[in-house]
């Protein structure tokens, strides 16, 4: 039985499209713990919109400017502008690759952001976010969910984030 809410999503060019939801997690750089997560329908802008939603809530809670490290899929002018509008400094990897038409893409992140030491630190910590998803697929229940409906899948996803944090905390205490 397939989930009627799922959408077809392709992870990369040349790959097959699969029915799925998209899980999004926010990780803090200092300890590597997941601090926010949500599940959305798979769309072309779901990652960026989820990022903006989670970061807006984080800024509101903290009451100060924060920085965020993101991969080059987030390097769009509208996303960078939206982040700056909600008091977030985007440390997004620059997407200046060459398109299929042979043109070089223009990054929305300029030298004013990339010259700071914090930018390189955010970029090195960014890779650790993938550990959350890797752990959830290998040890948790994120590889193939048995739940139907976005609410049930979201609960399962958040449970995996909590479990990841519980596994991670003893390693932090020992260090």
What are these regions (language model features)?
Residues 1-86, 95, 156-159, 164, ...:
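Polybasic low-complexity intrinsically disordered regions
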